[in-house]
């Protein structure tokens, strides 16, 4: 196996290899000028990735020739705007994905992007431009096998429903364990949000839903993370007695400490208004937590009525009601929370890294047999 990755990955990769030596794998590290790193940031990151892909292509061609490579798999990044030209290399099969990035704000939730409209408009324009480029260059036709991380991206690019949906995230088998810490210390249900506090994570939507739940009900919503929206969200809680009574800001929590947060919580809420999938979903499910999330994006692939609650809507009011109703269903029926949590842990066994590697290996072998 030959891996080409970014120069920024050299230190963590080599540190890992010192502790866990691997055979039959070789790493190459490719960098790009800092000029491009300064220009292409945030939602413009695809520009940086495409510069990197162009610099990688000659190296990939040489490795394919020298080592008689059978398959190239561009696994990351998952955004469709950054597909390389590796499918043009002679005598190899090109696997691409899972791809995301074609998601957009659902109708009814666009008000939650107030103050950030320019980002969504520019991003939408960039997506349409790259979709046009894919069509005129026929780049997707050079993919021997392609996967998508969510329906929204597949539909945006106009591919039919036979193209497989494969989540880009997975769990370590060792992390799929039975809960050992009871959550009912205070006889209240504990919801958990974990993620960066940016507008598209939907925390204002979550707060609007909380304000529809009767104040006297016993539950708590823990918010783990930090970000540019933190000040606004804190102020909103401090200004409302209902929110301040039911919302607790935990701040930034180290990854190594998140296990404890999962153990001390009952249900994970991911109220994102735009998301590819979200690693936190797999992490929570592996800890026996059911999920509440929108019936869109990658979460709609992972979660069903046996492992969590999916809410839908046609306008802002109905989305708020949908999220509120899902939370209420958890509060009034903790045994159902436990049942769906157990099912979530069972389901995540189909989404381990080993299972994913086995699936990829079958794809590679099938392509080479053909």
Which residues does each predicted region cover?
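Donor nucleotide-sugar binding/catalytic pocket of nucleotide-sugar-dependent glycosyltransferases
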Residues: 26-29, 96, 125-179, 186
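Nucleotide-activated donor-binding/catalytic signature segment of Leloir-type glycosyltransferases, i.e.
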Residues: 234-253
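Short hydrophobic beta-strand element within catalytic cores of glycosyltransferases
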Residues: 290-293
